[in-house]
Every structure is written in C-alpha cells, then in structure tokens.
Amino acid sequence: MAQGQVQVHFSTTSPDIELPEGKQQLLVPTNVRRYGLSQILNSEAMLDTSSPIPFDFLINGTFLRTTLDEYLTANGLSSETTLNLQYVRSLIPPLYEASFEHDDWVSSVDVLSGSSAAGAWGKNSIVEGQERILSGSYDGLLRVWNKSGQAIATSAPASIGGHTSGVKAAKWLSARQVASAGLDRTIRIWNYSESEDHFSAQLKPTMELYGHTGSIDSIAVHGPSNRILSASADGQIGFWTSHKSSAPEVNTSLISGPSTKRRKITTSTSTPQRGPLSLMDCHNGPATAVIFNPQDPTVAYSASQDHTIKTLDITTSSIVDTRTLLNPILSLSALPGIGHQIIAAGTTARHIALIDPRASAATTQAMTLRGHTNFVSSIFADPDSNYGLVSAGHDGTCRVWDLRSTRQGTKDEGLGVVGEAVYIIERESRKDKTTKTVGGEGVKVFDVNWDKDVGIVSAGEDKMVQVNRGRGVTRPEN
C-alpha cells in the first residue's frame, strides 16, 4: 500500500533559520511527526545545519502533536490540502534549579537583575552573578537572596520600623530601593545596600505610607518617576511617591492600633510617615491587582473581586474604561501582544482571560487559557517573547503558556479560542510526598516572576521560593 503524501509550506518568524523561497514548498509523507519534520528541515537539501536543531511546528496556531495524517483526519481535511507549517526552535523545559526556605508562607517575589525593570531603571548595572531575589512573607519580613540561596538581608521586625503583620507584596524600585505592602494596610519604603564583598546587605526603613483602610494585596512600581500604585481590600487604588519631600502629610487618624503603641515604646525609631498623592474609589469589592501600562506610566489597570478591570488615567485620577468579566479577578499582567497590548487576567474560575483594553476593541475577551484547577493568583509575561507567559495557581502549580498554541473551545467552554499550557511546574516540596494534595492544599502558589537572567521564580504556601529555568521555554535562547 502506497504511503500517502501531503504538500506543506514551511515558514518561520526567525530570519536566521528561514528557508530560501524555492525550498519552502515540499511534498512529505503523511505519517511523519514533529521529529520527522525536524529531520527534513535539518537535512542537507533544506537548512543544511552543521548540527541538528530540534524544531516544533505550528499549524493554524496550534502545536503539532500527532502525525500529519492524524491532523488531517481530526480537522476534516484531505491530503490535497497544502498545510502551512510554521517552525520554531523546540521549547526547553523549565527545569528545577533551587528552593529557598522561609519560616512562613511566602506571598511575593521580585527579581533584580541586569534584564529586570528595576535593574534597567537604576544607574548601577547589575553584574552577572549578583542578581537578587526579593521575597515577602506572612511572617511580616522581607528577605533578599542571592542565587546560591543565602538570605543576605532581612527587614527589620515590627518593633523597629517593620511591618506589623504579613507582607502581601514586595517590589524593587531600583537596585537601591524596595517597596512593600501588606495586611497592616501600609506601604513601606526601604533603602537597600550591600557590603563590599556582597555577602551581606541591609534593608533600612525610610518611609511609611498610610491611606488605605484595608489590606494592601498588590503594588506596582515605576522607578523613573518614583511612583507606586496599590490595590486594597477597601476597593481603592492608591497612588503614591517614594520621595519624602513630594509626599503629602499623613492622615493621623489612620495611624492607630499596635503600630502606634510600638512607636511609643521604641522612641529611637522615627521613620517618616506620609499619605497618598491620590486614592481612587474604583471598585465595589476588594481590589486585588494593579499594574502600570508598560508603554505609558500615566495609564494603569486595576482588577477586583467585583469582576471588573478598570483602565485608569493616573494624571487625572479618573476611570476611563471598564471591562466586566463573568468572575472575580485576582491577578493581572500586561502582555506585548501581536501588534497591540493585551491584558491577562487570572480569575477565581480557574482560567486566564486575555483582554484587549483598547476602547475600540470589538470584543472584551480575545482568548481564554484553561488548565488550572484552582484560583489563578499571579501572572507574569515571558521576558523573551511576545507569545509567552507563566501563571501561578492555588492548585499548587505554575503553568507556562504559548499563545501560538490554541484550539477551538467546546460549547461547555463557551466556544471562542482556548489556549492550553505547554509546561506545568509542580512544587518541588511535594516531590517526595506519597499523599496527593486536594486542590493544592499546602502548596498553593501565591506569586510568580519570570526573569531573563534568573528564571521562573515562584512563592507559596509551602514556605518556599522556587527557581526554575526560564530561558528558551517559549522561544529559542539568544
């Protein structure tokens, strides 16, 4: 029985591995899979590579995981069809690298490196090997780690200027400054300095910001303007400065309770206290996430358990657009998108909604990413790719997504375009356990960050910061 064949057209977005136009069309066997197609591309008659390059193939935005014949059958196509195969270098698994243990749940992580936003904002370049990981914990402390897993700095306790309750968010403002916020309803600014040998460091409290009446669950920072945004359980979005001289006076009625008593006892601590530049009444429920527009720091996006995403004009402290989803929203991230920006929103319904925030957009939701089995608590864009992102969930996993890998949704999924994870990162702390967790119990992941130099860094209920390889996961390494 003769082997079937099908005409294919090879294309790529990577100029360094693009075929000459005369070699882009080829008749290939229908029983071939990804590996066979990769061999064809590497052959002397095609790319003639000096050493084989593993390739993945996309057809209509979906990675090929079967034979071509099985793909044709599943999609009701005949072998007379010309298949357009987009080839990309194969993805590299996000292999486990290290874990850093804490005394309590870890709620927040951020990375300082030569490629991170804070590293780029600062005047001092970050030397390779001196990257730092910032973590915030429910024990009320911040810690700064080197890549070897040593905590080289720990923030002051409550008695001498630290948080009086759990930390929910922490960010590098620059290589010399950190912002944090949490259950004590305050934002705190810290100066960060290292010893000459870089084996030890210090976090010194320099300012306390008061204004919210509920827990602060998310902050965003813009180092060049010294601006900070906050999302609080009181439904408000706060706008702040890290410059003491520019910050308004504090409303003293907000400084009450245990922190005041501690101040009276510890007279040697005199951290300046300031108020917000503005507080915006944005949401009818707890505000859960806030981010700056990466291209325009006068624009921000906020999300809430009231099901809405708001586009904010920070200059006028006004709401310019509202998008309403079907479920409460817990996390946000801005993605470069293809030609325009996309907002990824993690929900309590276990999926990620991709939103076009432009007022002219015809539809609210451009795509849905499905796979998590519990709340989606954090999202971070791939620093190397327009197509990639990683999400953290209360199911105890981080999931890596490639927006080029899609399928048509079922009726139960509400139709539309659906994306599925290309990799699932489990918590390493569970690897030696024989009992299964239910819904992520004990290993919920609360935050995730994706840094080009350090990798995929996640934090969770297992009291660990976990580091996984991050380069080449959704695109080739440089």
Swiss-Prot record:
This protein's record includes keyword Membrane: no
GO CC annotation: nucleoplasm; PeBoW complex; preribosome, large subunit precursor
Tagged with keyword Nucleus: yes
Keywords: Nucleus, Repeat, Ribosome biogenesis, rRNA processing, WD repeat
Region of interest called Ubiquitin-like (UBL) domain, as start-end residue ranges on this chain: 6-89
Location in or out of the cell: Nucleus, Nucleolus; Nucleus, Nucleoplasm
Annotated spans, Disordered: 250-276
GO biological process, one term: maturation of LSU-rRNA from tricistronic rRNA transcript (SSU-rRNA, 5.8S rRNA, LSU-rRNA)
GO molecular function ontology, one term from the record: ribonucleoprotein complex binding
Residue windows of the WD repeats: 111-155, 162-200, 211-250, 282-322, 371-411, 440-478
Description of how the protein assembles with itself and partners: Component of the NOP7 complex, composed of erb1, nop7 and ytm1. The complex is held together by erb1, which interacts with nop7 via its N-terminal domain and with ytm1 via a high-affinity interaction between the seven-bladed beta-propeller domains of the 2 proteins. The NOP7 complex associates with the 66S pre-ribosome. Interacts (via UBL domain) with MDN1 (via VWFA/MIDAS domain).
Function: Component of the NOP7 complex, which is required for maturation of the 25S and 5.8S ribosomal RNAs and formation of the 60S ribosome.
HAMAP family linked to this entry: WDR12
Family: Belongs to the WD repeat WDR12/YTM1 family.
Record protein name field: Ribosome biogenesis protein ytm1
